[in-house]
């Protein structure tokens, strides 16, 4: 099953399918129209020669330095080259794939000003298995994953290195072998490619998915322990959960009852005179439920972030 990105509806399961199972990716027609509109507006700003951060000016401390339209493409290319300064072990290919997907989705919001050609290139890299080599250390966090995103995007412009069909190659060669034309960046596009939180969001997406599985495994372990110790399921009664209605607790209790449904061991001691089980058994839903609630909170934060535009500046085309 493929994943169609539109800048608004991407989910953690979508990220997992693309990152780990190589699900094909496409761009929605509505997203393409938004992208084209914002890109055209950047061209308009460039012609007006108005001071726009990162478009007609330098970056950071050089924000007051005026850049001529003739130099805008060089400015964007140099931005990627200068920020590719990461160190440390390389990120796994599955994380790099998630990064490419999330940055393409962020650009699809239509507030970045990059052309659809840039997004199409990132999607082609995903679909054809071109995986940039990205050092794991160097992000500045809330100000953006500038360094790791720069390493990721270098390959799109024919620089850096990438893994393609198991072989690590110069970026230009990897793109050529995959049959993907490299991008000649235009105004705003280098900044649009690296000014975001997609590296931390990619790692967070996969982590939330994996820890959700661990929450299920924890319930299985609790159910097996209750069975082995001939415990009672009375503490998992829905009425108990309704009296203290934390969502995660109720979900864990329901799961425990489902896991032990029809158990011969459970039936054999249904009328056992024991008053209650050990705390570690009867309070499993409360403990596991707190973890479930935390995971659900993280899920909402990550999915909200992955469907957000994180650029500076944002582009709001004039009506």
PLM features per residue range, with description:
Residues 31-51, 121-136, 178-183, 188, ...:
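Short, hydrophobic/aliphatic alpha-helical segments
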Residues 61-76:
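Glycine-rich loop at the start of a catalytic domain that most often binds anionic cofactors/ligands
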Residues 2-12, 175-195, 255, 259-270, ...:
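Acidic, low-complexity proline/glycine-rich segments
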Residues 226-319:
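Accessory "access/gating" subregions that flank catalytic or transport cores
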Residues 84-92, 96-246:
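Active-site cavity-forming subdomains of large catalytic enzyme subunits
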Residues 1, 182-207, 272-288, 319:
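Disorder-to-helix initiation segments
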Residues 1-49:
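N- or domain-start disorder-to-order transition segments that initiate the globular core
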């Amino acid at each position: 099953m493929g994943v169609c990105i539109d800048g608004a509806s991407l989910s953690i399961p979508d990220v997992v399918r693309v990152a780990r199972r190589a699900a094909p990716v496409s761009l929605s027609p509505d997203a393409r129209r938004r992208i084209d509109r914002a890109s055209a507006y950047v061209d308009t700003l460039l012609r007006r020669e108005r001071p726009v951060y990162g478009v007609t000016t330098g970056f950071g401390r050089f924000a007051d330095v005026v850049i001529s339209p003739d130099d805008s493409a060089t400015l964007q290319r140099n931005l990627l080259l200068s920020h590719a300064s990461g160190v440390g072990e390389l990120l796994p290919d599955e994380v790099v794939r998630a990064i490419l997907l999330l940055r393409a989705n962020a650009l699809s919001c239509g507030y970045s000003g990059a052309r659809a050609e840039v997004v199409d290139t990132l999607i082609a890299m995903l679909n054809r298995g071109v995986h940039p080599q990205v050092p794991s250390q160097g992000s500045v966090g809330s100000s953006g994953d500038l360094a790791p995103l720069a390493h990721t995007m270098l390959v799109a412009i024919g620089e850096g290195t990438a893994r393609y069909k198991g072989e690590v190659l110069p970026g230009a060669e990897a793109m050529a072998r995959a049959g993907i034309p490299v991008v000649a960046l235009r105004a705003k596009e280098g900044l649009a490619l690296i000014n975001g939180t997609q590296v931390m969001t990619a790692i967070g997406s996969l982590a939330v998915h994996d820890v959700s599985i661990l929450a299920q495994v924890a319930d299985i372990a609790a159910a097996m322990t209750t069975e082995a110790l001939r415990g009672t399921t009375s503490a998992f009664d829905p009425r108990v959960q309704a009296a203290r209605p934390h969502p995660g607790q109720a979900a864990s209790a329901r799961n425990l009852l489902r896991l032990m449904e029809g158990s011969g061991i459970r039936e054999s001691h249904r009328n056992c005179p024991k008053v209650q089980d050990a705390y570690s058994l009867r309070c499993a839903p409360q403990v596991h439920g707190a973890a479930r609630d935390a995971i659900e909170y993280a899920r909402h934060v990550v999915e909200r972030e992955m469907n957000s535009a994180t650029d500076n500046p944002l582009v709001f085309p004039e009506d």
